[in-house]
Amino acid sequence: MSTRLSKLFVRTLREDPVDAEVASHRLLVRAGYIRRQAPGIFAWLPLGLRVKNKVEAIVREEMERIGAQEVHFPALLPAEPYQATGRYDEYGPGMFRLEDRKRAPMVLAPTHEEFFALLVKDLYSSYKDLPLSIYQIQDKYRDEARPRAGILRGREFTMKDAYSFDHTDAGLAVSYQAQRDAYERIFQRLGLEYVIVAADAGAMGGSKSEEFLHPTPIGEDTFVRSPGGYAANVEAFTTLVPESIPIEGQPAARVFDSPDTPTIQTLVDLANAREPREDGRAWTAADTLKNIVLALTHLDGTRELVVVGIPGDRDIDLKRAEVAFFPAEVEAANDGDLAKNPGLVKGYIGPWSPEGPVLGSTSSTKVRYVVDPRVVDGSSWITGANVAGKHVLSLVAGRDFTPDGVVEAADVRDGDPAPDGSGPISTARGTEIGHVFELGRKYAEALGLKVLDENGKLVTVTMGSYGIGITRNLALVAEATQDGRGLLWPASISPFDVHVVMTGKDPAVGTAAEELVDALDAAGLDVLFDDRPKVSPGVKFGDAELIGVPTVVIVGRGAVDGMAELWDRRTNERTPVALADVAGALTAAR
């Protein structure tokens, strides 16, 4: 099949879009694949749809290979099933909510777990109907606070979501592994590097969750790896907890004057100058307990202050804090929050003062106090004394203060020990390209999805959920393969097999180009033919680079002698070839 560029609905651009942050966004717009309609919302043009359809075709082939069957749900759905599982509230402002003319609450679906479960409940009633895997490729909607990077993080996006249904946990494990293996094949066919990491389940819930992350410097996620094979999203990383320390015999806590210590380092310097350690070792930032006040907004709209104690050489990671306090929204407390709690002395906050406990549910402030896992019983700290200009030395956990709980909210760094003992971790950036969940019985229980088992007993079905971002994967392939001059698609999803560029005004050249296109078409190749008569060769070559078909055939003056040029966009090499041999050479290379 051939497509004439003179007839194709496309307009390439010389200038970058002003809001483009990453190469894929810039080039997909300039090459005429997508056009912005609103923040995070894009129209798909013919070139873009060709690539998108090929990504979807790969996904469909791999789903069919494992026996998953395709269905299709509406994007506009009633809110009630989401309310039944609690996700209507858990999604918070990220869910598009609306009402119909009868004032019934509706949503634009972010995911479809509830409705897949209800469909199976409506149709199946016996274990003999299971296992079942069904999927759809559907547009999803999430009201992102900050849409960015073009189609990498938009408010409308296309996703493949699959769901498995089993009546035993062993069956779920088999279904989960089949989907996991299919995902690996999909990403290999797309040519995307990936790392499988342990992940937090978030609003989805469930007993097991793994992400497929594509390592990229533009990634929004941080993940960690160890030499021994441990891998996790930083949000799911768990700190290796040190052993408790004997409390008996430790020095008593003592308050010391510490004016003009606006930073941890100035506090450490002052402590070393005025209060040297008895063991001769210098105080370090890791000996201090930094107490950070966070404001949590709960689902019912109430606002709660929580103080998190972390070692002073660490910082709060708000993404990890959001996981720790899910489903509440988390932000740093402001001066107004502190003003309402005069017991919290800014710059000198700590769990204890000379008057007694300050933080914790049983303290004078009643402010919840949670700590990093490294704050074990017997650990001794320098921290605030809740009096302006004063800190306390040798404040011992389990003796002088008892936190309300432990949370993973501190940042994770290169060299931290992996929790499984497999060595020091290294951190990297990545973007999620797929996510698989063992949901267990969360949704089935909430929605009453049961079947009769082998003994005639009603049992709750166990589910798995498996998502791949179609449009996100397309953008990441574009990002990973572009060469600075333009897009450079892998053959598996290129919009065309070959791009024929005709140059010159000689009628013989035009005839030769037409005959070549016919021969390529007859050979089963999908051809983009740049037949534009009044466009210069330089513009045509620039557009060929932008559009990104990996193989270009240039038909120019040499055509009168039966010759053309093969331009390999991957290597940028041009090779003379007889026109009569072009079709054979390209079909042999497929």
Swiss-Prot record:
Q: Which GO terms describe its biological process?
A: prolyl-tRNA aminoacylation
- Protein localization: Cytoplasm
Q: What is its EC number?
A: 6.1.1.15
Known catalytic reactions: tRNA(Pro) + L-proline + ATP = L-prolyl-tRNA(Pro) + AMP + diphosphate
Q: Membrane spanning segments where?
A: none
- Show the CDD domains listed in the entry: ProRS_anticodon_short, ProRS_core_prok
- Origin superkingdom: Bacteria
For this chain, the annotated S-S bridges are none
Per its record, what are the GO molecular function terms? aminoacyl-tRNA deacylase activity; ATP binding; proline-tRNA ligase activity
Q: What class of enzyme is it?
A: ligase
Give the record's keywords alphabetically: Aminoacyl-tRNA synthetase, ATP-binding, Cytoplasm, Ligase, Nucleotide-binding, Protein biosynthesis
Give me the Gene Ontology terms describing cellular component. Answer: cytosol
**Keyword check for Cytoplasm:** yes
Key word Aminoacyl-tRNA synthetase present:
yes
According to its UniProt entry, the function of this protein is described as: Catalyzes the attachment of proline to tRNA(Pro) in a two-step reaction: proline is first activated by ATP to form Pro-AMP and then transferred to the acceptor end of tRNA(Pro). As ProRS can inadvertently accommodate and process non-cognate amino acids such as alanine and cysteine, to avoid such errors it has two additional distinct editing activities against alanine. One activity is designated as 'pretransfer' editing and involves the tRNA(Pro)-independent hydrolysis of activated Ala-AMP.
What does the UniProt entry state concerning the protein's domains? Consists of three domains: the N-terminal catalytic domain, the editing domain and the C-terminal anticodon-binding domain.
* NCBIfam families linked: PRK09194.1 (NF006625), proS_fam_II (TIGR00409)
Q: Which family does it belong to?
A: Belongs to the class-II aminoacyl-tRNA synthetase family. ProS type 1 subfamily.
Q: How does it assemble?
A: Homodimer.
- The identity of this protein, by name, is Proline--tRNA ligase
Give the organism's phylogenetic lineage: Bacteria, Bacillati, Actinomycetota, Actinomycetes, Micrococcales
